[in-house]
């Protein structure tokens, strides 16, 4: 199954296409004034069976595109567990806030802290 993952942030929209849990391709676009338009451009590329969104605009994406949503915390933990199985933490410095996530075994979230800029 091919999955399109979208991180719809306040400054950029990041896309990754996965098959069997492995990355096939990735792209980034500026969010601009309409992050959903940037997300739509990635969706229109096709080549996916399923879409999941995270980030600042995830709920709008669910309304616009009917995709599944996950929190950024869960998305980061899952990604770290797949790409860096020994990772103990994740740091995200985003356009809206900064997050620090402590990971346990298999990418399980042990704790996290977040501050707004």
Predicted regions and their residues:
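N-terminal glycine/serine-rich phosphate-binding loop of ATP-dependent small-molecule kinases
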Residues: 1-73
């Amino acid at each position: 199954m091919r999955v399109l993952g979208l991180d719809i942030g306040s400054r950029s929209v990041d896309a990754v296409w996965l098959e069997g849990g492995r990355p096939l391709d990735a792209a980034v676009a500026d969010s601009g004034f309409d992050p959903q338009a940037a997300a739509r451009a990635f969706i229109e590329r096709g080549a996916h069976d399923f879409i999941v969104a995270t980030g600042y605009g995830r709920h709008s994406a669910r309304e616009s595109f009917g995709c599944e949503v996950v929190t950024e915390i869960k998305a980061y933990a899952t990604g770290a567990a797949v790409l860096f199985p020994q990772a103990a933490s994740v740091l995200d410095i985003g356009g809206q806030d900064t997050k620090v996530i402590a990971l346990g075994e298999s990418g399980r979230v042990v704790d996290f802290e977040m501050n707004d800029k």
